[in-house]
């Protein structure tokens, strides 16, 4: 009887400690709001692409950006090491893989799994503005 009471007390304290830790971690994460119209876009090493960091560090791990493709931008065939999630805000993100082509427009969502070979680009007249989230460090590795 005493043993089960002690086990119950230890379990309860462990749960409470865990909840306090999670609560503290959540408290330290601020709400983030960034308007795509007010975001600070910076050119990237990929000509025709600019990005505005929203959270995380795209050079080190999970991150999110607003990304712009200039009109007619062509990324060529490539892969990303990590999963990428995209929601188009303006223009059209053009996507192609072995299954076919997609014109991803405003309000549309696209998930590209890490290691999946694909082509992407911007609409010839409007380009593309999209929210992009990555599960790890950003990379774009050319593929044949």
Q: What is each residue range found by the language model?
A:
Residues 9-18:
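Bacterial N-terminal signal peptides
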Residues 17-61, 144:
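A short, N-terminal "cap"/entry segment at the start of jelly-roll beta-barrel domains
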Residues 51-53, 64-66, 85, 101, ...:
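Conserved hydrophobic/aromatic beta-strand scaffold that supports enzyme active sites
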Residues 58-59, 98-116:
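Short acidic-glycine-tyrosine-enriched beta hairpin
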Residues 70-73, 80-98:
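Glycine- and acidic-residue-biased ligand/ion/polar-headgroup-sensing regions
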Residues 114-138:
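Ligand-binding loop in jelly-roll beta-barrel domains
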């Amino acid at each position: 009887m005493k043993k089960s009471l002690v086990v119950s007390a230890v379990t309860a304290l462990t749960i409470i400690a865990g909840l306090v830790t999670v609560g503290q971690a959540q408290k330290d994460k601020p709400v983030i709001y960034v308007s795509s119209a007010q975001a600070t876009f910076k050119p990237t090493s990929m000509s025709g692409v600019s990005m505005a960091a929203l959270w995380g560090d795209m050079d080190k791990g999970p991150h999110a950006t607003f990304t712009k493709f200039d009109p007619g931008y062509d990324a060529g065939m490539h892969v990303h090491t990590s999963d990428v999630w995209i929601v188009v805000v303006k223009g059209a993100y053009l996507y192609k893989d072995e299954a076919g082509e997609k014109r991803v427009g405003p309000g549309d969502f696209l998930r590209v799994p890490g290691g999946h070979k694909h082509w992407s680009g911007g609409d010839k007249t409007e380009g593309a503005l999209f929210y992009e989230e990555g599960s790890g460090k950003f990379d774009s590795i050319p593929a044949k």
